Regions:
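His/Asp/Glu-rich mid-to-C-terminal helical/loop segments that flank catalytic regions of hydrolases
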Residues: 239-286
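Non-catalytic positions within long, well-ordered alpha-helices that form the structural scaffold/packing
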Residues: 103-106, 203, 222
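A short, charged, Gly/Pro-tolerant segment at domain boundaries
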Residues: 279-314
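N-terminal amphipathic/basic-hydrophobic helices that include classical n-h-c signal peptides
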Residues: 1-20
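Generic non-transmembrane alpha-helical segments
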Residues: 163, 167-178, 265-273
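Active-site/ligand-binding-proximal alpha/beta "capping" segment
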Residues: 174-208, 295
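Zn-dependent metallopeptidase/amidohydrolase metal-coordination segment
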Residues: 212-250
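Metabolite-binding pocket within alpha/beta catalytic cores that recognizes anionic/polar moieties
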Residues: 15-157, 313-314
Length: 314
């Protein structure tokens, strides 16, 4: 019976489609702000009415169950990037599922909280940086939703949302946490830390911080028309600083504890101060980016990307 209904044509089928679109349009978002916590931030304090949900996506399962709740009067979705217990390598993270799950929940803004190494003397462990640029040195990650008959090229000159980044930086100031309002985050594949030669080259290129995850998320968030900004929590000087021993996991964890506590304060303040409406261009990133004639896009591809491209399909 289900098979026959699926292949029905004519007015009945058209009415069903119209009804489905109508229901979809009326559906309220379960969250408008997404928080992706990195090393050291595996849960979000201060959430009320918190509950866990498992979100299924066309790209597989996210890193963990997503925690939904209310923070400072706004609906928030929290996801531990590496899974609770820190069990997923940077290269193993299902970035597409993580970002798509946020889109399915109605998230319009993603705040990333990530541990990074410093490549400059004046960027000290314990301080925060709100990155405004990324440099991608990852090797073999799936960093696009597109393909399979649909080509899109989104603008990525400015990879983070200026409005969201400004709110994050101001929140750091409000909480008396030293913050650097701009800088380039170089993203490496990992999981190994840099060699001394690599660190020196990165410094010569005048990058500010180094991490292993954020550029992939930023690319996917842009394709999903979600604002994205990073709180980069500095834990160490990588391996280049002559007066500091080479970076070790224990050194990072010690600083992470302090940074995680500070990040919770910043997140609460930032979420409270976020304007209800977006005035940036992130929400229309695909408007002039879809290259393929949508009439010839395979139905399977349209279905898989419905949450992202639905508003552009007539």
């Amino acid at each position: 019976v289900a098979t026959r209904k699926f292949f029905q044509t004519g007015k009945t089928n058209m009415a069903a489609k119209k009804n489905t679109r109508s229901k979809s349009a009326k559906r309220e978002p379960q969250a408008t702000v997404g928080i992706i916590g990195g090393s050291g931030l595996y849960s979000m304090g201060g959430l009320t009415d918190a509950r866990e949900i498992k979100v299924k996506t066309p790209f597989g399962d996210p890193s963990d169950a997503i925690v939904l709740g209310t923070l400072e009067g706004k609906r928030v979705a929290f996801l531990a990037r590496h899974g609770r217990g820190h069990r997923i390598l940077p290269s193993e993270i299902n970035y597409r599922a993580n970002v798509y799950a946020m889109k399915l929940l109605g998230v319009e803004r993603i705040i990333s909280v990530s541990a990074v190494g410093s490549l400059k003397e004046d960027l000290k462990p314990g301080e925060f940086l709100v990155a405004d640029q990324f440099f991608d040195r990852t090797k073999d990650r799936k960093s696009t939703f597109f393909g399979d008959g649909l080509v899109a090229h989104v603008a990525f000159a400015h990879p983070t949302c200026g409005q969201l980044s400004s709110v994050l930086a101001d929140a750091c100031v409000h909480e008396a946490i030293m913050v650097h309002r701009r800088g380039t985050y170089i993203c490496i594949e990992g999981p190994q830390f840099s060699t001394l030669a690599e660190a020196e080259v990165n410094r010569q290129l005048r990058f500010e911080v180094i991490g292993m995850t954020n550029v992939t998320e930023a690319k996917l968030a842009r394709e999903a028309e979600i604002c994205y900004a990073t709180i980069a929590m500095i834990t160490d000087y990588d391996c280049w600083h002559p007066e500091h021993e080479s970076v070790t996991t224990s050194q990072i964890i010690a600083t992470l504890t302090q940074n995680a506590e500070n990040s919770q304060k910043v997140l609460r303040t930032a979420v409270r101060e976020l304007p209800s409406e977006r005035t940036c261009k992130c929400g229309s990133a695909l408007q002039h980016s879809l290259v393929t004639d949508l009439k010839i896009v395979p139905k399977k591809t349209k279905k898989r990307l419905a949450a992202i491209i639905g508003k552009y399909i007539s």
